[in-house]
């Protein structure tokens, strides 16, 4: 019996390579960042200062889950103020549009009812889960909004486009509550030191 070894040669011609899955989302986010950065939307000079002691805080987040409870409990512990919650979907195809509608809704409040600061919050998630917060229309709305906005999207390692165009970015929803109101004891001490 005889054995013949055959050798084959293959040639692959590649015209285009595209990043698939999470890589394509990261590429899209980076392209949006470049575009918005060129427009000046991320510039520090446009950041609005947060009020030291707001009368009312608007919170845009999911009505379920730990995020809303963390924010409410932390504000209550520090310095209770009136809070208006605008529940939205924080994940999925309509989420960015829902958040834009919530901002529009807050802007239509009468002056005396309008929040002094707004927190947009969501817990952590995958790149895909956080894509609504990388939406270009939402980023522009956050940048142009007349009320200061604190973004609290995800955890320490998560950064979204609205984090760059909000007036203050914090790493967690609990941190957003801490930045929104002072500690009652700090305020009392400040008043006592003033006298």
Please report, for each region that a protein language model flagged, where it lies by residue:
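Short glycine/threonine-rich loop/turn motifs
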Residues: 58-195
